[in-house]
């Protein structure tokens, strides 16, 4: 899964909001609480 995280981080650096994608991916591991109103940029700190 790490390669996916790196890819999302690269896209995030380009200013793309992946909130919906992050919810579908990360909610399965950490639950919806960590994903609400956040971008993948915020979530990479958790990863």
Swiss-Prot record:
Gene Ontology MF terms in the entry: DNA binding; DNA strand exchange activity
Keyword Amino-acid biosynthesis: no
Signal peptide: none
Keyword terms, alphabetized: DNA integration, DNA invertase, DNA recombination, DNA-binding
GO biological process, one term: DNA integration
Keyword DNA-binding: yes
InterPro entries: Resolv_N
Residue ranges occupied by any Resolvase/invertase-type recombinase catalytic domain in the UniProt entry: 1-47
Disulfide bonds: none
Similarity comment text for this entry: Belongs to the site-specific recombinase resolvase family.
Name of this protein: Putative protein PinH
């Amino acid at each position: 899964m790490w390669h996916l995280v790196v890819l999302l981080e690269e896209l995030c650096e380009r200013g793309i909001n992946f909130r919906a994608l992050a919810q579908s991916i990360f909610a399965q591991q950490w639950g919806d609480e960590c994903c609400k109103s956040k971008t993948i940029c915020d979530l990479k700190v958790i990863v």
